[in-house]
Amino acid sequence: MVFLLDNTYFAIYRKLWHTDRKGIDMQTKNKTSVIANEKIDNKKLANAEKIILNLQQELKKYIKKGHGPFLAAIYDSKGNLVAKTANSVVNKTCSHNHAEMNAIKLAEKKLGTYDLSKYNLSIYVTAEPCMMCLGGIMWSGIKSVYYGVPSERVTKITGFDEGFKPNWFNEFKKRGITVYGQIEQSAGETVLKDYVANKHTIYKPTR
């Protein structure tokens, strides 16, 4: 299990999300906790904090244009931006158009390949990837994942269905994919709360 620490309580991630604490590192910073499937590298973390905070701020503009409340960016190992896209499920009427999937498609088109592994790319997302996007990331060849708001909080704030993702941190580690999560979480939660407060569409199928 992964213990999440903030200034008021300890919370335990559901077993559905993380079933094994082994191999998970945690660093408490600014009263929230960053978790990773490797020993936390402060240089990587500092870079990710800067990128994700900028994405959280930029996301507000995308929402005003009709996009969903998630933004993803893909960078190469030299820090060059390869692709950046927002969620476009509603405005493009396609359930697959999550921010991560859009960014991956754009990167593959730009680089002319379905296999991104040789480019050593990292994806930065304002929130934890859903079940579909985890599959897309894994099969694209992306090497590292950095995200903001964890799925448990996304669901609680918005009502979005993030799918089932048992022990995905360790599954990604087995495949050589680095994961850092809960980066600039507070800023990301504020954007999601504003999205809900302004009565934007919570897109999911009727059950």
At which residue positions do the language-model features occur?
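A short, polar/charged loop-to-alpha-helix boundary motif
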Residues: 90-102
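Immediate flanking context of iron-sulfur cluster ligation sites
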Residues: 117-127
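Short, glycine-anchored, charge-dense loop/turn motifs used at functional sites
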Residues: 77-82
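Short beta->alpha transition motifs characteristic of CBS
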Residues: 83-89
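Zinc-dependent deaminase
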Residues: 9, 23-63, 129, 136-207
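Short beta-strand scaffold segments in enzyme catalytic cores
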Residues: 70-75
